[in-house]
A protein has these predicted regions:
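Short, solvent-exposed recognition patches
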Residues: 47-48, 65-196
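Amphipathic alpha-helical segments
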Residues: 52-70
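Intrinsically disordered, low-complexity regions
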Residues: 3, 28, 35, 122-124
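A short, solvent-exposed beta-edge/loop patch
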Residues: 2-3, 11-21, 133-244
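Alpha-helical transmembrane signal-anchor/signal-peptide segments
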Residues: 25-50
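A generic secondary-structure signal marking the coil-to-beta-strand transition
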Residues: 62, 96, 202-204
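Generic detector of ordered secondary-structure context
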Residues: 49, 56-57, 82, 198, ...
């Protein structure tokens, strides 16, 4: 019985995706983002200007220094032209870093894809997937449900020696007044929005990524949760239900 229910759900989601594609191409009204946008210059790997606005990721968090990171040519070629980006790397005094990235759709919903597609292309193997919650205190207390991926790869150090690396990758989806942890949930909410309101919800996916040595995954995740709790209220306007 469980398999039948799952099959019906997946069939409904597939039908919803087809329905979305047809409605999107018909030029539906585009909803507001659940993130703050700002005028800024974003560049590709060759330092060429590619955008003059983006997601307003904060420049200062804790005692980190930060700098914008490039939007890759692969992304610019693959994703729709009306995609909006946010990209920043935050460096800690201990030489570790956390990279934050946002991809925000425009009228073309295909900007939003499963982040799991990106990691294997960068040489990472996904070892563990789990849904976790991160407490956020502003503008009110709520729990942010996110997907946590623990990853691994082998890389070469400065001396050319092959060494094992671990990565912690955290992501979720956000639109105006809406949050989602799973890709299918986001698609379903988008479909309901089109049917009930006639508005194409403007979804984004937000990611945070850090690498570490094997055995340091829990410490790295703890650092990331504190960082996310501090940074999210500075650029994300959508929130979860208020905690009692």
């Amino acid at each position: 019985q469980g398999k039948i229910i799952l099959a019906v759900f997946l069939l409904l989601v597939a039908a919803a995706a087809l329905f979305l594609a047809r409605l999107s191409s018909a030029g539906q009204a585009l909803g507001q983002p659940g993130l703050r946008l700002a005028a800024m210059e974003l560049h590709n790997e060759d330092s060429q200007l590619v955008r003059t606005n983006g997601v307003a990721l904060p420049a200062q968090i804790f005692d980190c220094t930060s700098k914008p990171t490039p939007v890759t040519k692969l992304e610019l070629d693959w994703l729709p032209r009306d995609t909006t980006y946010g990209r920043r790397r935050y460096s800690f005094p201990d030489k570790t870093w956390i990279e934050s990235s946002v991809v925000l759709m425009g009228q073309d919903r295909t900007s939003i894809h499963k982040p799991e597609y990106c990691l294997p292309g960068q040489g990472f193997t996904i070892d563990l997937r789990e849904v976790v919650t991160i407490p956020i205190e502003r503008p009110h207390a709520y729990d942010l449900s996110v997907m946590k991926l623990t990853t691994s790869k082998r890389a070469r150090d400065r001396n050319g020696r092959e060494v094992p690396l671990r990565g912690v990758y955290i992501y979720w989806f956000v639109a105006d007044g809406k949050l989602a942890t799973h890709h299918l949930d986001r698609m379903w909410m988008m479909t309901k929005g089109l049917l009930s309101e006639g508005v194409l919800q403007r979804w984004a996916y937000v990611t945070y990524f850090a690498i570490c040595k094997p055995g340091d995954e829990d410490t790295t995740f703890d650092k990331m949760t504190k960082f996310i709790a501090e940074s999210v209220p500075k650029f994300q306007t959508a929130t979860g239900p208020r905690k009692n």
